[in-house]
Amino acid sequence: MEKPIVIYTDHIMNRTLCFNFAKGSNSLMCHVNDFKDYSKTIATYGVLRGTLEVIKKVQNFYYIDHGYFNQSGRSFKNKRTKVLNLNGYFRIVFNNFIHNGLGQYPDDRLKKLNLKFLKQKKTGKYIILSEPSETMKKVYNVPKWTDDTIKLVKKYTDRKIIIHNKFSKEPLQVLLNNAWAFVSLQSTAGFMAMLNGVPSFFTDETLKHIGKIKDIEKPIINYNIFNNLAYGQWTLKE
């Protein structure tokens, strides 16, 4: 396959990630405003500042974003996300925004992460509904995701539903302590929930196989996906 043209913006995060990707793959770089040849394969970080529009027009793309595990530090305050460092892992996905977790990869990369796996919970008081950002609602064209998903979940369970997003005051880690299940569009927080013994369910077609909402009262955590996901994320040094 041809080397991708790396599309960068003026944002520091995008420029840093794109520069490192281009350096590692020996690829050419092009500013998002100057890119016109949509027959080319591209690579870029994030979906803001014109990158999503380019992604929609090309046939093949590599998408870069925060990883599945051991992500870089971030804070979420006043409706803004602040990246505290770039020491964590970043995912790279071909022709999608997130990996489906399928495959038969070994466990060597997963072991390097030193993750702590908790056994699947057998009890729980409520279901966490992880609300996607407005940006992701637009990307996936699901403007009424929260309302539609609440209705869907209520078809299969009468458990209490707690809506949570990255700006919620109560930390997700605290909520997971008494949660029965975690439901999201495609949030990587779903994998953190699984690490904490809370089964995750996704509405995105790419991830639906991990947990189907119709099975929310008889959940099973498939730990095999973690080996595969660990092979889809890298540090800047790598």
Regions picked out by a protein language model, each given a short descriptive name:
Residues 1-53, 135-136:
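N-terminal pre-catalytic "stem/leader" segment of glycosyltransferase-like enzymes
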Residues 9, 64-68, 125-136, 204-205:
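Short loop/turn segments at strand-loop or loop-helix junctions that form parts
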Residues 15-17, 50-54, 69-73, 135-139, ...:
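Short catalytic/ligand-binding loop motif for oxyanion handling, primarily in non-cytosolic enzymes
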Residues 30-36, 54, 151, 159-210:
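Donor nucleotide-activated moiety binding/catalytic core segment of transferases
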Residues 40-41, 126, 180-181:
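Structural motif
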Residues 48-80, 147, 195-209:
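A short, gly/pro- and small-residue-rich
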Residues 75-124, 156, 210-238:
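Leloir-type glycosyltransferase catalytic cores
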Residues 122-167:
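Conserved catalytic-core segment of nucleotide-activated headgroup transferases in glycan assembly
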